[in-house]
Amino acid sequence: MADEEMDGAERMDVSPEPPLAPQRPASWWDQQVDFYTAFLHHLAQLVPEIYFAEMDPDLEKQEESVQMSILTPLEWYLFGEDPDICLEKLKHSGAFQLCGKVFKSGETTYSCRDCAIDPTCVLCMDCFQSSVHKNHRYKMHTSTGGGFCDCGDTEAWKTGPFCVDHEPGRAGTTKESLHCPLNEEVIAQARRIFPSVIKYIVEMTIWEEEKELPPELQIREKNERYYCVLFNDEHHSYDHVIYSLQRALDCELAEAQLHTTAIDKEGRRAVKAGVYATCQEAKEDIKSHSENVSQHPLHVEVLHSVVMAHQKFALRLGSWMNKIMSYSSDFRQIFCQACLVEEPGSENPCLISRLMLWDAKLYKGARKILHELIFSSFFMEMEYKKLFAMEFVKYYKQLQKEYISDDHERSISITALSVQMLTVPTLARHLIEEQNVISVITETLLEVLPEYLDRNNKFNFQGYSQDKLGRVYAVICDLKYILISKPVIWTERLRAQFLEGFRSFLKILTCMQGMEEIRRQVGQHIEVDPDWEAAIAIQMQLKNILLMFQEWCACDEDLLLVAYKECHKAVMRCSTNFMSSTKTVVQLCGHSLETKSYKVSEDLVSIHLPLSRTLAGLHVRLSRLGAISRLHEFVPFDGFQVEVLVEYPLRCLVLVAQVVAEMWRRNGLSLISQVFYYQDVKCREEMYDKDIIMLQIGASIMDPNKFLLLVLQRYELTDAFNKTISTKDQDLIKQYNTLIEEMLQVLIYIVGERYVPGVGNVTREEVIMREITHLLCIEPMPHSAIARNLPENENNETGLENVINKVATFKKPGVSGHGVYELKDESLKDFNMYFYHYSKTQHSKAEHMQKKRRKQENKDEALPPPPPPEFCPAFSKVVNLLSCDVMMYILRTIFERAVDMESNLWTEGMLQMAFHILALGLLEEKQQLQKAPEEEVAFDFYHKASRLGSSAMNAQNIQMLLEKLKGIPQLESQKDMITWILQMFDTVKRLREKSCLVVATTSGLECVKSEEITHDKEKAERKRKAEAARLHRQKIMAQMSALQKNFIETHKLMYDNTSEVTGKEDSIMEEESTSAVSEASRIALGPKRGPAVTEKEVLTCILCQEEQEVKLENNAMVLSACVQKSTALTQHRGKPVDHLGETLDPLFMDPDLAHGTYTGSCGHVMHAVCWQKYFEAVQLSSQQRIHVDLFDLESGEYLCPLCKSLCNTVIPIIPLQPQKINSENAEALAQLLTLARWIQTVLARISGYNIKHAKGEAPAVPVLFNQGMGDSTFEFHSILSFGVQSSVKYSNSIKEMVILFATTIYRIGLKVPPDELDPRVPMMTWSTCAFTIQAIENLLGDEGKPLFGALQNRQHNGLKALMQFAVAQRTTCPQVLIHKHLARLLSVILPNLQSENTPGLLSVDLFHVLVGAVLAFPSLYWDDTVDLQPSPLSSSYNHLYLFHLITMAHMLQILLTTDTDLSSGPPLAEGEEDSEEARCASAFFVEVSQHTDGLAGCGAPGWYLWLSLRNGITPYLRCAALLFHYLLGVAPPEELFANSAEGEFSALCSYLSLPTNLFLLFQEYWDTIRPLLQRWCGDPALLKSLKQKSAVVRYPRKRNSLIELPEDYSCLLNQASHFRCPRSADDERKHPVLCLFCGAILCSQNICCQEIVNGEEVGACVFHALHCGAGVCIFLKIRECRVVLVEGKARGCAYPAPYLDEYGETDPGLKRGNPLHLSRERYRKLHLVWQQHCIIEEIARSQETNQMLFGFNWQLL
């Protein structure tokens, strides 16, 4: 039959080319009897051809061929007509109720704390956004991959199971259309096709043969093409695999990386093709090379090309099945049926089970497809989900064992699907009842851990494998899942099966009971710390499971009693050693106890007692249910053996006490760590707390005296309480004292800790409230810190939110820090100093805080215990411990020793505890007396405490001893507490003595009242004393104040004449800017320039602490500084740099300020010599350091010695040279030196230089005016006639520092090697001056601060030093070079100056031109023979005319670029419309329009032009004011210290010698300026710019800010979920990162998006930062809610994100998962970090505080 079919198959034309019509194969298949065989023959012909090129496949062509040749024909065969039409019909037939989206790693999931049945119930982004849960208390988390959206699952949600999209009755769907049944023909076809397709997928996926295929798939002409296939494993790192491939295949790095990335993503990859021998050789080479770098060789196989082809297609067919099943429930059901059918006559299980069992052997890519198949079929149909779960449980043990042996992540293992089944309540019940799943899981645990069992059948995890044990936790997790929701209805079968599972679980606990026993090390310290982490980790994993088992048991009284019996039996079986050992007798004060001879300090002891603790938990639940009375029916009294039950927990507590007493210090850190976790919040519920409960159980059942004797014996303190003890050994005394303190503390806990439902009459809410109260008594805490200190239940809930507002109030956070909760005053009364969850540190802190608070409130410092709640009936006898003989003996002994001056067997802490016990006893008796008549109260603490200790003559009772203690000076701090106790004795005495006729409660109230009266009297007395002290202090202060005033009046003259020079450096602006300078002289430019008030400047070096006056002739002093590239002001973010550093001409700055060079300083001063020594020392120490360098020493980086800011240079501090102008000369010169004359003089000078340096060439002398003037006017030396003086001389030290700083600016600004002779060095100096001023002005404007009134100290000092450095820097350069630069700068405003590459007026930033021209201008006075500079008067005119010319040019710039759309411009103010300024603006603009051929337009009204001009020019004027102030030292007007926009403009104009109506400038200089205006407007470059309006920069430039972020963080996550990597089409986890500068989303930390920069690989973020922020950038990691600051290629740091939860806290990594909202204040702070150029500083500071040996590789971010 097979042969005949083969012939038939061959007769059909199945060429590899796509068939003309997909119906052909479909109709041919229809004629075959056996579809499976025919289908396989079809695939045998086509698949090897389609998937032939495995090494370098054309994926698009492959997909097209598969679709046309195989999948479309299959769809035709399935539907019998055009599949596109059928699928479209099915698509619109109605919404399916289950979402079923499978999460990929990194996707955000949402859970609702209000509605989810458990935390594993999650929603995908889309369902969440359209669900009711959006407005609930939701949580956000990042999926590890493999989960499943539970939208539509009614068992997952208490309310709101459907989102809008999956709602059954939503608009557009009817009940009928929700399930649109397929017609019978399609169903019949599906039943025929699906089994064959599934069988093929399964067979090919689990195919083991490397060289052969099943007979049906074999073809006659077999090729000899093989592949060497490398598989992924978790033993080898990326680099290991790349190294092995490079060596074995002799390939390039890029090819090896490509292979490695594919292997990591898909799980396998063909790395070599060829004949079998070649591939085999490659396989051996790869294995041997991989063994060189790791113990495990890489997994490599040689596969035939046809096998590879079919395996690849099988997965493609799986994806197709996923698609088809998404259209119809019928398809899913048919698929599930086919998967579950077992082949008749075969031993193999059903197909889905075969896939499950093969899962661990499959590679990653295959697993993903197959898991998706399961998700889209079985998990979408509840009935089949149940059947799948049964198959899963059937093979559970085998699957888990294989997973534990596997090395792949849990998320891609079939075992990870357990959460989808075991957490469904009905399914969990079914699996417990039908398959005893609890027993299956617990037995699996025992079967996978046998290697860790010792000869006593106890676990011992010494030398454990962390990876393997981590995988075992998955099994423990499944136990948690199955128990996560308690049954509401108990059937007999469920009860029986649960008990069976519980017994099985007890076997695990039996192996843990007493595991890893230790013995105290004596004499010699332990050599190697034993492993302890594994045992504690398993304890943590089991914590909630233990609680859940107890809760399940407590659901049913009979079940609880049976479970108690089973647990009791298990404890007794583990305690056989104890019962059979030798006994000893303990005697004290007439009582004796026979107990086992055992010492914790000598014998073996274990901290692990889960059986005993489980029994304690069950006992509490019995008490809570009131079922203790029935306990004897299940556990007879004689068999209860309470001494045995108490023994092991007591040993544990004794061990803790002895560790505190340092008796176990030779046992190393291992034991200390175990003790820490024993009491830590992560473990204490099922360790420490349960041990206390077990002792309370013992105390409630045993005779109190015997119980205390047992405690004394185990604490090894019976000798310490014998009267005869006498020792001089101080260490032993200290040890005894510590042990007594620890024992007393445990006794306090046994008697006083009743806040456990079932132990005391309390609710769960009261327990949590008490925990919170005691945490907040330590200090106010943020929400997360409180939550961290509270135990979580199985749903990760603490119950905190439900009660926190009852006990505390929330205090909102500021710009930094977080919000905190503060305890309400009314909750302070519940403070218990000996709260059993306090650590030693917390106890001390809480006690200190509460005493301090009481002192501030003028209250006594006594901290008695609050009245405890009543014990439950089962525990009511515990209070008898307080009044028993042994307790009285212990207390009396402690007090007697304290009174005895010679005794040292007591401490103050011990006394405090004894007082606390006394207080508890008296409170207990008081409460009982208040509730019942005296004769009914059996508790008799008062009389026992009042009784004499013995019949001796000097015998004393406790009250008498307290009176004596009150008088001991050393116990002054305890005096208030003693007083409180003595008063309480009186209160109880009065209650006892009241007549029986009076109702007890009444007498109790009277007692309380009298007690309150006493307290009130004391309080009033204390208040009176405090008031008297306050008045006394006030009187003294008044006297001192009077004396002070008198002294000042007497020495008034001295105060008036003293100038405050000393505080100069601390002030923000110089003091001369106020009253010392008249308002008229506050002008910086022109002949009316005010004086520069300079004072002697004496600075202190932060390194040597020596003072030095700043003088030109002295050695240099320097400011630490940082020069950096900046894009903070750019108007064109991400603008590419046209030229590299070598070719860039920095003389002219583009008006968009795309890239600037910023110089900032922290303001700290050093001697230049001291700094050089410091820098050399830093270099030396850096060479000796082993950890990563924090800064780049080659680039001159260092940390400021004082503030640790990152610096890379120093600015020399040069004093300002005072320049005084003679007013008479000024007036004379004003008549002579007009603007026209000044321009001619300047042009003549420049022309003269050109003639001088042109070497014989005839230069063109620029002519500005038509009329000729005499030659004498143009004389070369005429500029000198207006006033000169000799140049300033600087010391060599200052010159050196000037050259050093200038070279640094050049090197960093242009990113070139240092070259102090480069002609661009002065250009970069001017550029950084201009840009720094612009950046500071922009920052002040952005913050709405005044120009001079809000400068930070470091900004002020930095600008002052920078400007004076720039003046000096010119003198270190050849003046000929400066001339050339000046000529080029002036050519912008004087177009007739012939110069190369002069930019158009709209293509240059004129403030940069102004700074360069002002600083370079003195070079015109230089001559070969004599070194001159302009006189103050000459300078004043030079500055004035330069500034006026450039200002007029800038006005033209602004008006030409003004947006004529009035709606977007400034609003019209009252009176502006017909103002003089408006008329001038209109007239001037008409003139400009004529010169620009009408391109400028003239549609805008005058008032609009004037307002646009004023707004546009203000930043320029502000920058100019800063420039001239720091250049000349002239005090600015008062208005510039205040915050007034109107006053500011007129003050700026006044200071800069401008008319407030700026158009008057043009009128004043009209004859001179008109030809210039014509040339400016007629410039072809300008006219071209005007035609392209959109490309023009408008003024004022927009202030940059960080991008707008959404208020709700989930919107950002939604945005990230749609992010697709631009270079990768796969669904692998990506790390979307948002650039906060420009809003680009990048693919971070992925090889796919790495770039090569200067031969080095850099990540997408670093590459983006180089273009977007000149190497500096701020990113937000969206899926982690982390802000990252990046600088350069190798530096970065984390920074608090601006998103906060409702408690004012950030949530990096979304660990807590609370809803997050944008904090505008935090975001503003981040914006300021950027605009203040502090990003580099933040990074350096962060790296300095978080130094690591191996840091994060920022380069690949």
Swiss-Prot record:
Binding residues for Zn(2+) 2? 99, 112, 115, 124, 127, 133, 136, 149
* MF-aspect GO terms: L-leucine binding; ubiquitin protein ligase activity; ubiquitin-protein transferase activity; zinc ion binding
Q: What is known of its domains?
A: The RING-H2 zinc finger is an atypical RING finger with a His ligand in place of the fourth Cys of the classical motif. The UBR-type zinc finger forms a pocket that mediates recognition of type 1 N-degrons. It exhibits preference for arginine in the first position. It binds N-degrons with a methylated arginine in the first position.
Lineage at the top is: Eukaryota, Metazoa, Chordata, Craniata, Vertebrata
Q: Where are the zinc fingers (RING-type)?
A: 1101-1204
List keywords of the entry alphabetically.
Acetylation, Cytoplasm, Metal-binding, Phosphoprotein, Transferase, Ubl conjugation pathway, Zinc, Zinc-finger
Instruction: Tell me the enzyme class.
Output: transferase
Q: Which reaction does it catalyse?
A: S-ubiquitinyl-[E2 ubiquitin-conjugating enzyme]-L-cysteine + [acceptor protein]-L-lysine = [E2 ubiquitin-conjugating enzyme]-L-cysteine + N(6)-ubiquitinyl-[acceptor protein]-L-lysine
Q: What is this protein called?
A: E3 ubiquitin-protein ligase UBR1
**Belongs to which family?**
Belongs to the E3 ubiquitin-protein ligase UBR1-like family.
Q: What is its main location?
A: cytoplasm
Query: Where does this protein reside within or beyond the cell?
Result: Cytoplasm, Cytosol
